[in-house]
């Protein structure tokens, strides 16, 4: 189901109920841009902290324009999952000094057009949102009784014009009509809040309240002392305004409250965007970033990482093309997994997706991630308990517990990021040290071209005459070492901190000097004692 500002508040109770009743929730998002510059290129040298530091300053200029959530409920009697999917269309907003901005890239626009992204829905019907830090700012102005002035700062000309026109209508009604009440239709929640307070200030004798059954109408009484009616309390008006401005943050808070497992595919960037857009600006500290995410989403599963780890249990003939989301979903949906020939759960959508549905639509991709999670969990549970048992969500979650809070890291020094514990030590093959024997300055591009024939590598200088090479597989290391064993142009060996780094060599020389000096001192002392 598409969720925009037109139907969000009508559906919010249903969304809340589906979140509460679910056994897990899958997530996906579509972005306005991606990091493509050379400085953001994935590298096998990267630690997770270095990767985070590369991205944190640039993420603020990019936004999630679509968020997909699918709530999976389990029916034990039918041994089936019921999936309810939502696609939330989000659009930045201006309120006071909060001027949410974003950039688009031509390549991203082309990609989104290819996958039928609805830009009109994004711009005209997009749901507003704030982060928790934005909410704290609004509440501070509210406590200081400055919320009215703060919100007024960002009024556009058309909004000011509407407020003035409505005020004139009320003035005319008061002077020329005998009716006791008057209604104003105000769709804009910000204008509605401001108009309540503006009218009370201009015409102290009137009473304003929200119309029963229609929150977009302002009901005005000529006499504020009329029996049975009273002004809508300012606190209620402020609550309503902030509730509107928070927008999609209500859903984030529901996810935080109910602590349901969150499932996604390749979630590293998703977590960066989620933090920046709904928690607050990304912190300088990588550790604090992980802590903040874990406090909101304490249980995360990444099907990209899980499938990577479990693929080692498949034979070559039964493995998937790749563990990209589309390939993984089709592998399971087309029942190509021989590990899942018996007893798999039915997964049924409450509202089917459009027959022309394509990948890279957030709602559909979220569903696909959840579907793959169910199949991976079933496979893992079967290995633990056998194929004859009914396997519900608890058994699946227990079987996948070793992968909990481990988010895939693409082409980095380690294969995953751990949001609840320390990250793992580097688990890539040993680095190679390449020394140029003929030239005084190593040609890094030439070395990259030569060694690139062995497979995908990353390379960086290590002094004037040497470079470090990172590979993705041990067989590449072995093959390179064997091929260049007696090469006259380059000496290639396994990298050693003590042997090849300046600090390491300095430590060795310092140790040698200290050891030598101590030995001379002892010899001198011994010789002196003999003479005496």
Swiss-Prot record:
Keywords: Exonuclease, Hydrolase, Magnesium, Membrane, Metal-binding, Mitochondrion, Mitochondrion outer membrane, Nuclease, RNA-binding, RNA-mediated gene silencing, Transmembrane, Transmembrane helix. Its main location: mitochondrion. One of its GO terms (molecular function) is metal ion binding. The chain crosses the membrane at residues 503-523. It is a single-pass membrane protein. It comes from the Eukaryota. Mg(2+) binds at residues 28, 30, 270, 365. It is an enzyme of class 3 (hydrolase). InterPro entries: CAF1_poly(A)_ribonucleases, RNase_CAF1, RNaseH-like_sf, RNaseH_sf. It is found in: Mitochondrion outer membrane. Its EC number is 3.1.13.-. Pfam families: CAF1. GO terms for biological process: nuclear-transcribed mRNA poly(A) tail shortening; piRNA processing; priRNA 3'-end processing; siRNA 3'-end processing. One of its GO terms (cellular component) is nucleus. SUPFAM superfamilies: Ribonuclease H-like (SSF53098). 3'-5' exonuclease that specifically cleaves precursor piRNAs (pre-piRNAs) at their 3' ends. Trims pre-piRNAs to their mature size, a process required for piRNAs maturation and stabilization, and subsequent pre-piRNAs 2'-O-methylation. The piRNA metabolic process mediates the repression of transposable elements during meiosis by forming complexes composed of piRNAs and Piwi proteins and govern the methylation and subsequent repression of transposons. Belongs to the CAF1 family. This is Pre-piRNA 3'-exonuclease trimmer. The gene is PNLDC1.
């Amino acid at each position: 189901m598409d969720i925009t500002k037109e139907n969000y508040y009508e559906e919010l109770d249903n969304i809340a109920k589906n979140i509460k009743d679910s056994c897990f929730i899958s997530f996906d998002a579509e972005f306005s841009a991606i990091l493509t510059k050379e400085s953001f290129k994935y590298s096998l040298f990267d630690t997770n902290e270095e990767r985070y530091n590369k991205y944190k300053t640039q993420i603020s200029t990019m936004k999630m324009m679509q968020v997909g959530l699918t709530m999976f409920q389990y029916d034990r009697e039918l041994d089936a999952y019921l999936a309810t999917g939502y696609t939330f269309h989000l659009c930045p907003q201006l309120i006071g000094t909060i001027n949410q901005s974003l950039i688009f890239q031509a390549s991203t626009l082309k990609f989104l057009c290819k996958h039928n992204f609805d830009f009109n829905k994004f711009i005209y019907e997009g749901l507003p949102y704030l982060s928790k830090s934005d909410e704290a700012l609004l509440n501070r102005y509210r406590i200081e009784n400055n919320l009215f002035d703060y919100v007024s700062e960002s009024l556009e000309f058309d909004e000011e014009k509407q407020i003035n026109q409505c005020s004139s209508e009320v003035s005319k009604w008061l002077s020329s009509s005998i009716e006791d009440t008057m209604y104003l239709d105000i769709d804009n929640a910000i204008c509605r809040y401001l108009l309540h307070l503006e009218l009370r200030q201009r015409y102290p004798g009137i009473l304003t309240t929200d119309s029963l059954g229609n929150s977009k109408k302002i009901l005005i009484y000529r006499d504020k002392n009329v029996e049975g009616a009273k002004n809508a309390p300012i606190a209620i008006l402020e609550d309503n305004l902030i509730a509107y401005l928070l927008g999609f943050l209500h859903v984030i808070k529901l996810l935080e409250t109910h602590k349901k497992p969150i499932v996604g595919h390749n979630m590293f960037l998703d977590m960066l965007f989620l933090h920046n857009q709904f928690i607050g600006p990304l912190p300088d500290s990588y550790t604090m970033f992980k802590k903040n995410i874990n406090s909101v989403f304490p249980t995360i599963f990444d099907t990209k990482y899980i499938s990577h780890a479990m693929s080692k249990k498949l034979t070559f003939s039964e493995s998937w093309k790749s563990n990209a989301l589309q390939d993984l979903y089709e592998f399971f949906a087309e029942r190509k997994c021989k590990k899942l020939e018996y007893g798999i759960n039915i997964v049924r959508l409450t509202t089917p997706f459009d027959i022309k549905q394509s990948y890279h639509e957030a709602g559909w991709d979220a569903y696909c991630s959840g579907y793959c999670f169910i199949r991976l969990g079933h496979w893992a549970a079967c290995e633990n308990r056998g194929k004859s048992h009914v396997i519900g969500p608890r058994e699946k979650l227990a079987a996948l517990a070793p992968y909990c809070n481990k988010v895939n890291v693409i082409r980095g020094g380690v294969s995953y990021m751990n949001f609840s514990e320390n990250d793992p030590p580097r688990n890539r093959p040993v680095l190679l040290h390449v020394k140029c024997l003929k030239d005084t300055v190593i040609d890094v591009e030439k070395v990259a071209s030569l060694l690139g024939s062995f497979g995908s590598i990353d390379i960086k200088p290590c002094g004037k005459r040497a470079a470090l090479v990172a590979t993705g597989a041990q067989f590449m290391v072995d093959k390179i070492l064997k091929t260049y064993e007696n090469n006259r142009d380059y000496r290639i060996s396994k990298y050693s901190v003590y042997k090849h780094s300046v600090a390491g060599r300095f430590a060795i020389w310092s140790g040698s000097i200290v050891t030598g000096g101590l030995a001379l001192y002892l010899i001198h002392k011994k010789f002196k004692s003999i003479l005496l």
